[in-house]
Design a protein with these regions (language model features):
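Positively charged, low-complexity terminal tracts
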Residues: 1-118
Length: 118
């Protein structure tokens, strides 16, 4: 059975690496929230972050292409062209925190164990 190596968690979801035995499978990040799971590369996670930022900008009253308001919810685009998510403003903020927290931890670990090592 595969275990996980947690990257970041908030009240809305979790991000983690899958592990096989003691080895971390680091080429993809599992992101779970709202009964959904996404298996993103770091590039896709960064792209998702940019799409979230676009949606937040639109939510704040700016004109952003590709984001449509649906009642009191939003359509959040994902790196998967055929998949958009209908979310509330509260969910948008929670997803934003989850993705930003995950990217922060990934970048911090890269610095500590990668480029920042002497």
């Amino acid at each position: 059975m595969k275990d996980i190596e947690q990257i970041y968690r908030n009240n809305f979801g979790i991000s983690f690496y899958w592990k096989e035995g003691n080895e971390i499978i680091a080429d993809k990040i599992q992101l779970l929230f709202k009964q959904m799971g996404f298996y993103f590369s770091i590039q896709e996670l960064n792209e998702f972050h940019d799409l979230i930022e676009n949606c937040v900008t639109d939510h704040n009253g700016y004109d952003t292409s590709g984001v449509k308001r649906v009642f009191n919810k939003f359509l959040l685009k994902t790196p998967y062209v055929a998949l958009d998510l209908e979310i509330s403003p509260v969910e948008l903020n929670s997803i934003k925190d989850l993705v930003e927290g995950s990217l922060f931890r990934l970048n911090l670990n890269e610095y500590i164990y990668g480029s920042g090592m002497n």
